[in-house]
Amino acid sequence: VPAGVDDAAKVKAEFLAKVAKGEESCALISKGKAAELLGTMLGGYNVKPLIDVLGDAEVGAIAAEGLKKTLLVFDFFHDVAELAKCGNANAKAVMQSWADGEWFTSRPEVPASQKLTVFKVTGETNTDDLSPAPDAWSRPDIPLHALAMLKNPRPGIEADEAGSRGPIKQLEKLAAKGNLIAYVGDVVGTGSSRKSATNSVLWFTGEDIPFVPNKRFGGVCLGSKIAPIFFNTMEDAGALPIEIDCGQMDMGDEIELKVDAATAKVTALKNGTVIAESQLKTAVIMDEVR
């Protein structure tokens, strides 16, 4: 069940709130587990139930841990502040954590070096290649819609079923090498702005988001040229888009990508030999990915 503020999230939050408060019991989920799961819902319907149990001796500390990593609290901030003023130790801990930015500092830094397997798409890829208009009906279902990515024949891309299903088997073979896959292209993401295009790329190149189904984040996208709108959309999704010469990167290559956070210098190596160098568009992108 998704986090956030859709109808399903409301039902999820209301049920977990009742269990966390002890108003309902569930053989599969304890009070503590219910509070922990509420704390994974990112904001919205989960915020008030978490605040309501901050004074609970059994689950208050668990609720505090969830709130520490929740940013989308809006006016409920004042409720936590008021509880802290009244001496609630868990509320005080949440306020201090927010002040210290632990929601950010607790996350792992972007690795200075990472091994990637190249999924190379030669020539120009536009957003309709990545998220075909005839498949627009499936865009809300990211894993389903991703099956249509690159479904039309093009050099080097082995569609499972030309015109209907993209190179899923080819991508699975690359994933079997054990590294994250990098989407690599000559010109990437031209055409109209489509978040669905980014979603499809990240489905195959990103990592699961804890407690959020059917969506991924992170991933690396390398392009000799990346269209500005696509670059920004990748950035917003927590991916690492880098403009770098991809001429010596071929389908299936295992490369090492080094990023120096201090200088924003990017180095790509194949078999230990430097094959391309570049600069991040902004050093801040390392913090954005984190």
Enumerate the predicted regions with their spans:
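Short inter-helical turns and helix N-cap capping residues of alpha-solenoid HEAT/ARM repeat scaffolds
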Residues: C26-A27, G55-V59, G87-N88
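Feature captures the catalytic cores and cofactor-binding loops of soluble hydro-lyases/lyases
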Residues: W137-I275, A283
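Amphipathic alpha-helical scaffolding segments comprising HEAT/armadillo-like alpha-solenoid repeats
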Residues: P2-G22, M41-L54, V73-A84
